[in-house]
Amino acid sequence: MFLAGSFIVLCGLLAQSTAQLAGLPYPLGQDLPMSMGHCRSLHVGQTLPYYGVTPVVSTYPSDHLDRNFRDAFRHGLLSGGILSFLEHIPLLNYVRPTGSNAGGLVGVLGKVISSIPLLNNILDIRVTNPQLLEIGLVQSYDFHRLYVTIPLGFDLRVNTLVVGSLLELSVKLDVTAEVYAVRDSYGRSRLVIGDCIYPPGSLRISLLNRLGPLQNLIDSLTDILTRVIPGLVQGVVCPLVNGVLSLLDVTLAHDVADALLRGVQFVIKT
């Protein structure tokens, strides 16, 4: 029996590739992103894949491997500036109708927005209190892949033309990244990102204060935010995930990659 902490690193150092951490995925005037680069979106209704492979029975002693991976993943996202990126997403640019001072989107969504004059009453939208909640980790049925759930939360403060009317909204949503291991022709293993998706239905927007006279505006704003936020957040998070994988501790990355390549279960269900 081999202890996870005592593996000799035979595969050498993982390449320390530099991840381009972009604040916003696309400039105004382009359609909202559904994926970044190699981060592909799942179709609506598509579930995480089942590979139909019988799990490998192993005594690989990896009691703390899942916890260490989650902790390192969380630290990487935070040190990579995920909260700052969320806080500086200029949502107003994507919500105000085309032709307003703040600009707007083109395409189908832009036409929908421009047909809602109530949105002209919005003066400013600020993201406050961004949070990275507890990261979830699930292994595929064949134990060769990981699905990392990145739960995010933040509040929105919306200033309107109506004097004394400040809307406060709470937003929560998940981004799920698929992680698997590959081995090159020299036998060196590394972790790579597969699909990086916004699971449909994970977005939750709730009103923190009650403003009856503005209910129509609230309904219109919530509808637009539901369409806009997932693509923007996904465009921020997915490149960061790729950067986190490339900068993981070498020993931890090797142990996780080795376990996945062997098809060893190490994620402890709680």
From Swiss-Prot:
It is found in: Secreted. Keywords: Disulfide bond, Secreted, Signal. One of its GO terms (cellular component) is extracellular region. GO terms for molecular function: lipid binding. Its main location: secreted. Disulfide bonds join 196-238. Expressed in interpapillar epithelium of the anterior part of the tongue. Residues 1-19 form the signal peptide. May play a role in innate immunity in the oral cavity. Belongs to the BPI/LBP/Plunc superfamily. Plunc family. This is BPI fold-containing family A member 5. It comes from Mus musculus. The gene is Bpifa5.
